[in-house]
Amino acid sequence: MADIELVDTSLRDGNQSLWGATGLTTAHILQIAPVMDRVGFRALDFTSSTHMGISVRTHKEDPWELIRLTHAAAPHTPLQFIGSGLRFISWEPVHPDLIRLAYDRLVVAGMSRFVVLDPMHDMEAVLRTARMLRRAGAREIIAALTYTISAVHTDDFYAGLAGQMAACPDIDRVYVKDPAGLLTPEAARTLIPAVRARLGEAVLALGDDDPPESGSLRRNTKPLELHSHCTIGLSPLTCLAAADLGVAALHTACGSLANGTSLPNAERVVANLRELGHTVDIDDRLLARVAGYFTDLALAESLPAGQPREYDASFLRHQVAGGVMTTTRRQLDELGLGDRFGAVMDEVSRVRAELGYPIMVTPFPQIVCGQALYNVLGNERYQHVSDQAIRYVLGRFGRPTAAVDPDVADRILSRPRARELTAEPPPASPAELRRRLPARISDEEFLLRATMPAGEVDAMLAAGPARRHYNPGLKPVLDLLAGLRERPGMSGLVIDKPGFRLELREGTRQ
């Protein structure tokens, strides 16, 4: 049996899956980061450009400062950033030089482990981004194989991609990313060996300027990781199957940030792995402390706790995650058309096939579900098309894995709006953007202002430094004090218990 490592996802993907990425503030993270640093995790899945935008927009906190502070609080555990290499914060593609600057600043701030995820599996883009990250100083680069079920996403398809990743010197590891929780234990038993076989192939070792005949064969042993969500209840079993099949690391979450649509519960995964004979070098006492902290935080902040999910076979057909499904159902209910929900879900499967089987991760579920809604409610299919759907067919999000249905592509691109979007100017270079922005701002502020509304960045700066201390046990008391302060005629407060007395009077110190 094997020694299995854990990558904790509580701070980013667990937070995003269960709390909409808005649950954790700087203070929440800094309170537990030193403990997480000592648990024995291989890495902490920490942030993305989307999360950085949420820090500014929702919490009015500086995401760059959060990275620096967390790196200082957890210096022994790599912090992980996930991105596509096409965008930064906004969903619009940005200039490559702006991405280079962002990666440079992320490394300087304290990020050392980077995941390259291209939902279209455009390998040219993946390899280009990996080179960019290596030049920026990234210590560990992981390429993502994003799992889905379709006519084109076969074991051979993923194995072929893995072979290209294995041959890239800038990629250190590969992980199977299963964002919808679709990977069954049975499917894992064919997929993982196929991928690992290509990751272990002999490759030609060459210097940068060496001719092929001067190289030597070496065995490439790039490890494989698994990141699988619990959306339909399969992930805990799939993780155990993956460990038996030679996966080096599993991605998990802690306490209230596990289960539901998040990742498997770390404590339960560790116990099950050991039961099967695997070893996991984790400090169980500290792991329990981390889990307890997030459970207490959820209770204090009235945030939902992830619960184990029951198996839902229909999900394998439409692959629409809970959040997008809930939004679609609500939209239909508001229109008095709730009875059409089943028809929309059936149309989702058809639209996805016609668009070349995009993997259902943001923004593609929104594009596919929106188009399905238009098709079901309109007089004819593709009579109405969103700008994002047009941009998708134009290739603005990358090259689709399979060709878009020619008739559908013609219907979408023949409309006047498509011609307008075709004429959109390319992304502005950093030099052009700097000419539009205030002089003498730091690179970090420039990156925020180049990709976010000015008012949001101004509000963040005006809010001042983020709080750095948090205790979930004090939250009810602080809420009580805040509520009492708002009551008219309240001139004093006394808290009295054995061994402790606090008396507050208006205008006095006691």
Predicted regions and their residues:
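N-terminal small/glycine-rich loop or linker at the start of catalytic domains
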Residues: 1-22, 74-91, 108, 138-149, ...
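Conserved, mostly hydrophobic/aromatic
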Residues: 14, 116, 174, 246, ...
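Terminal or standalone catalytic/regulatory effector modules within metabolic enzymes
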Residues: 37-38, 43-54, 309-312, 319, ...
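Active-site beta->alpha loop and helix N-cap motifs at the rims of alpha/beta catalytic domains
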Residues: 43, 47-163, 180-183
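Alpha-helix-loop-beta-strand connector modules within alpha/beta enzyme cores
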Residues: 57-82, 131-143, 189-208, 213-224, ...
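Catalytic cores of alpha/beta
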Residues: 157-161, 232-245
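Core active-site phosphate/anionic-ligand binding loop and the adjoining beta-turn-alpha structural block
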Residues: 237, 270-273, 280-337
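Glycine-rich phosphate-binding active-site loops on the catalytic face of alpha/beta enzymes
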Residues: 245-263
